[in-house]
Amino acid sequence: VYTDSRQWTALDALDILREQLTISNDAAFERVSGGIEFEVFRVSARGRDPFIIKFPGTRWIINDNDRDLDSFQLMDQERRLIGFSHEHGIPAPRVLAYPEAGSFPVLAMEIIDADDLPLLAGELGRMTRRLHLLRPPEISTVAQRGRSPSDVVAQLTVERLKVVEQLSGVGGAVPTESTLREMLGPIDADVRLLHMDLRRGNYLSRDGQITGLIDWSNAMIANPVLELARLVEYGEFSNGFAAGYEITQREAATLSGEAGLACSLYTAAMLAVVFLSEAPDPELAAIKVERVKELLTQFG
């Protein structure tokens, strides 16, 4: 019985998949990765190529960055956005199986051949631009909670800044939610599908070229400046990225303006909370808290 309160394992996931895939009883699996939200295993079974399974450890995600996110909805979103990627030429793994609505959500996917070589210059920028040029899908992303980008980003920024203050003891003047919402107005216009977590663990590559975008949990439908500001805070927005993205003067001006500042604060606060609370790392936490302080000084 798959209740909201139980913890799930790879064996649970395989049991569900047996209804759609032929999986031998002696199938072996090894944990590939796991994060705050999901577990990922490699499965080897007689008579078929190895494949990947991804599933939530528990239904409700509650932490200092996110409150009451439904991992079942996130899994369905992942399936839909992988399908959208395939339809529009964005590399992504092929979905092998996904249970019917109402069942425990486990995603079975092909294994994409990948290596650890660094990306070619501008590759991440080019792939990000390809994504941002697409007409967005008709989907309400879980991260947006059915609200406008400016509304949800403003609220989450203020909430996360309060957590940063509580956990670090570092205070100071914090912009109000209404002030941030006004500054963030541009992210409600000319919206596109944003991945919102384009770091090394969330894309696969081979010979320096991206072969698959994965993990769409943070996806939003908003103006690309929100994602560009996130990439600045991730340390991914290099000259090579900008060249590959072919950033325009207008986009650069928006990114360096008040909308970009508010977007950067949104991500900086999130990262500070991650390293203060969700994945504690005192050294990184100190760096991220200092970055939050630096950004706050730029608000009038």
Q: What are these language model-derived features?
A:
Residues S33, E37-S44, F51-I53, V95, ...:
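Active-site acidic catalytic loop and adjacent metal/ATP-binding pocket
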